Amino acid sequence: MTADPPPARRVLLLASCFADAGPAIRLAVTLAARTRAPLEGVLALDPRAEAAEGAELVTGRRAAGATLVVSRERLSLAYAADARAFRSRLDRAATALALRTSFRIDSGALPDLALGLRQPGDAVIMGYRRFLPLRGPVIALEDGENGPAAQLATELARALGLRARVLPANTPPEALDPLPVGALVLSQAIHVDAVRLAALIDAARCPVLLAPDG
């Protein structure tokens, strides 16, 4: 028996920079348009940057493993520019489909914010794929092809002109690493903690969607 994907009460799009948010906006707008759900963009500030004082340097790592060292002032300017670009692109995309939208800035790592901000009925997307459009299949991690996450992945793939694929719920993050994943859909029936979520994001290198619960 096929389980229809539940409608989203609200669609949250989280990203730590505009480059990661950009490719995920199309996915977020497509999901929100499904049920006319309000769309909320959240720029996630690195908590290490906020903890730095004065001109103290902040270090971090990108997906490629290179270490970044920037001043707090320069990082603040970059976040301000990202916030403007993120909000502008989100507003334009939402306005084109007459969707309600809002934007805010919060602090924290993406997995922690996703699990902390999510409320019952919310769909949460974590944007992660630098500069690249969505091209690979939309993959659902779910046991069986008729569950709500699998059905949602199929609907989104069809709307985006992509393929859909279902992998077992217990698929380890390292199995996603070689796959050209366009987006990853996770059922909320799967227990996803912040550590596993971070590992899945890093391995898939694509937008990750926590599907709304029923």
Which residues does each predicted region cover?
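Charged linear interaction tracts used for macromolecular binding and regulation
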Residues: 96-100, 120-123, 127-139, 143-145
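Short beta-strand segments
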Residues: 43, 127, 187
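Small/aliphatic-rich secondary-structure junction motif
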Residues: 2-69, 135-184, 199-203, 207-214
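Short, basic, helix/turn surface patches
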Residues: 66-74, 130-131
